[in-house]
Amino acid sequence: MNLGHETVRAELTDEEIDALRARFWLDDAILIWLKKHGVNSNWDMTHAHIVATLWMLLEQYKADGHSLDDIVIESMADVCALGRRLQGYAVPDAAAVMERLAGAVPDDAGKDDVFAYLTKAIEASLGIAAPWSALDSPLWQLHFEAFQEWYFGDELYEQTYGKAPYAPGKEGFLRREVPLGTAEGIRRMFQELKRRGYALAIATGRSRMETAVPFAAYHWDEEFDPRHVATYTDVDEASKMLGLSLDKPNPFAYYAGAFGTYPERYAEYVSRPDEFKDGEYYIVGDSMADIWCAKAMGAVMIGTLTGLDGPAARAMFEAEQADYIVDSVEDMLDILK
């Protein structure tokens, strides 16, 4: 939208990234708040932040006597046009975004409810329909594509989505990620779990490519049957096939990981998951969505203190009665004998 006067650069140092994250996400307070409401994907969290920011900008615009009746946000051209109209208005800071989100959304709201409450509050405040605030709206799709451009970089983005990035010139942050433990230590953990007789599966909110790149780099992919690695891509394909919303905190990703990514079975995973269960299941995760899914699946929950909250997440896991809590994912070997 070209609001403000800062220059956007593609390559940033780790220190610059940390500073931007602290500035825009209020030292992770906004991310933690969203995750506690089950908003777990990077794209949805970004959408919530930008929707709240647009809401406050449009309030300023309306207060100056301008009509909002012709506001449309469905394409990059619409975004640029709106940016020109909003030039000169103060962009809300992260503290204002946090206050606005918390004021619009009840404490007990789940993921889908978060955006329903936001939309209701925006429409009441601005006096217009706000279809752009919903998940999977055209504006959400623009955020998704922009996020993936930065995360994947030019080469992987074009390889994955079959089109050139809107703003080329990025190497991608995916290649700069580091694991939440030692890469070799995690691989040995996978090997030891298999030696003890456990079958391994993955259920992740990352896309197929986002999962494949680090797993190949650390050789973790060699420890998994690819049919038991369920990604956001698999969930998205199933959602479109069945006409249902299946992303976390819906347990579908866990069913697909545990039972196999077989599209011909997906409808039955949704309607009759118990028919596919065989033995006891353990879910290892660091978020509220993982806890909800473990309960829905009837699985044993092992909470790890490796998420945004770090050790402070212990209180959440205890309140939700997680079966086990460990400091690191590698500590699960002390539980799974």
Task: Write out the residue ranges for each language-model feature.
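Short, compositionally biased "basic patch" segments
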Residues: L126-P165
